Design a protein with these regions (language model features):
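Short, non-transmembrane alpha-helical segments in secretory-pathway proteins
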Residues: 1-37
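Eukaryotic scaffold repeat domains enriched in small/polar residues
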Residues: 4, 23-30, 39-53, 88-91
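Hydrophobic transmembrane signal anchors and adjacent membrane-proximal interface regions, especially
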Residues: 10-11, 20, 38-40, 61-63, ...
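Exposed beta-strand-loop-beta-strand "reactive/processing" segments of non-cytosolic proteins
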Residues: 34-76
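Short, compact, well-ordered microdomains
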Residues: 67-91
């Protein structure tokens, strides 16, 4: 992993809560969260969070969103109820 200590990142509080909701499910089924990149898409009534695994050193990309570090999972969370309404594991 590259040294990124001098890079600043930002996540808005309104998205942080949805990340926590998704992470509570993610940690039961996946590996190390530090091996994933999280993408957030704000829809009208839902938030979509995609947890995409990084590539291990020397690993080549494969079709289907899976690497030796885990597999891609997409969470759809209701803005109103703040509950997961759909989970999609990519193959």
């Amino acid at each position: 992993m590259e040294n990124s200590e001098n890079v600043n990142y930002m996540i808005l509080g309104k998205y942080f809560i949805y990340s926590i909701i998704a992470y509570e499910d993610f940690e039961k089924k996946q590996k190390n969260i530090e091996d994933f990149t999280i993408y957030i898409k704000d829809e009208n009534n839902e938030i979509e969070l995609t947890f995409h695994p990084n590539l291990a050193k020397g690993e080549n990309p494969m079709l289907g969103g899976k690497t030796s570090l885990g597999r891609t999972v997409v969470y759809l969370i209701s803005k109103k109820d703040k509950k997961i309404i759909k989970i999609n594991y990519q193959k």
